[in-house]
Amino acid sequence: MTKAAELRQKDVAGLEAEIKSLQKAHFGLRMQKATQQLGNTGTLRTTRRDIARAKTILAEKQAAK
């Protein structure tokens, strides 16, 4: 889980890279769930929320400019 304080310290490019990596991880987890290889389905929820958290902070930074 990524904390909001950690994300706020990153610049816009860093946030975009973080979002991209989280989306890749989320896709992999979804594929594991579809093939019934994922044991802990709660990781899907936390990954989805981490993506939303990062996107929110990115939007805040872009609006501040």
UniProtKB/Swiss-Prot annotation:
Task: List the InterPro entries hit by this protein, alphabetically.
Answer: Ribosomal_uL29, Ribosomal_uL29_CS, Ribosomal_uL29_sf
Keywords of the record = Ribonucleoprotein, Ribosomal protein
Q: Which GO terms describe its biological process?
A: translation
Q: For this UniProt entry, what's an example GO CC term?
A: ribosome
Q: What highest taxon heads this organism's lineage?
A: Bacteria
- CDD domains to which the protein is assigned, alphabetical: Ribosomal_L29_HIP (cd00427)
A GO molecular function annotation here is: structural constituent of ribosome
Coiled-coil annotated residue ranges, if any: none
Q: Name the Pfam families for this protein.
A: Ribosomal_L29
Say which family it is in.
Answer: Belongs to the universal ribosomal protein uL29 family.
Q: What is this protein called?
A: Large ribosomal subunit protein uL29
What's the source species for this entry? Paracidovorax citrulli (strain AAC00-1) (Acidovorax citrulli)
Q: Which gene encodes it?
A: rpmC
